[in-house]
A protein has these predicted regions:
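Multi-pass alpha-helical transmembrane bundle typical of ion/small-solute transporters
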Residues: 1-233
Length: 233
């Protein structure tokens, strides 16, 4: 639950910031917010559909193929979170200016339709990453219901924070927030790597190094917060 909550909060706030920056630009320009709303709504619905389809596909597959699909999804999630953290460290400070420039270019190029498309692609990227990352993390959770609950709480909290930032009623250090959550996401990614190795073994893709050398499970009691942080799941 802790991992999915952090993922939902971080990814949700990134998406909320994108929407808020573009909305503020449109408001200052005296433009309608309708194209933005249409693009965002379409991206959110498509992201949810991707997650549902991946989960349905995995459930319909035989056990060995389920493990193979879990391995692929987990590996993709690790790549996503790694590139996301690196991108935020190098481009996070310029995100505001980049989005405003892209919004202005979209309006000049194709008006409302181009802006809706830009908003759709920007939010879809975040939504697709979130869907894959949450699915991979929930596969490693002992309780799927708790994992889903954590994701919902994180996304709702991100939406509330994003709205507060847009309205100007909430102010906090975004750089520090993304740094702290980035550390937790590195731990989550490390846990996903372990889960990818496990599912790859169960799928028959890895057949070496299977002998247990020692057991340190007593250091991280199952279900504890310490276990969630240390194992990344």
């Amino acid at each position: 639950m802790l991992a999915t909550l952090i993922i939902g909060l971080r990814e949700g706030l990134e998406a909320a910031l994108i929407v808020g920056i573009v909305a503020a630009f449109l408001k200052r320009s005296g433009r309608s917010l309708r194209p933005l709303a249409i693009g965002v709504a379409a991206a959110v619905l498509l992201s949810i559909l991707v997650g549902v389809l991946l989960e349905a596909l995995q459930t319909a597959l035989p056990q060995s193929q389920q493990e193979a699909l879990e391995t692929v999804i987990g590996a993709v999630a690790v790549v996503f979170v790694t590139t996301m953290i690196l991108w935020m460290r190098t481009h996070g400070r310029d995100m505001h200016h980049q989005l405003e420039a892209r919004s202005e270019a979209a309006l000049g190029r194709g008006g409302s339709l181009a802006l809706a498309g830009m908003a759709f692609l920007a939010v879809l990227k975040e939504g697709f990453e979130t869907a894959v990352f949450l699915l991979a993390t929930m596969q490693a959770e002992t309780s799927g219901a708790l994992g889903l609950l954590g994701a919902v709480i994180g996304i709702l909290a991100a939406g509330a924070l994003g709205w507060g930032l847009y309205q100007g009623g909430i102010r906090f250090n975004l750089s520090r927030f993304f740094t702290i959550t980035g550390v937790f996401l590195v731990l989550v990614a490390a846990g996903l790597v372990l889960n990818v190795l496990r599912t790859a073994h169960e799928a028959g893709w890895i057949t070496i190094g299977q002998r247990q050398m020692f057991d340190l499970s007593w250091l991280v009691p199952a279900g504890s917060i310490r276990a969630a942080v240390i194992t990344g799941v």
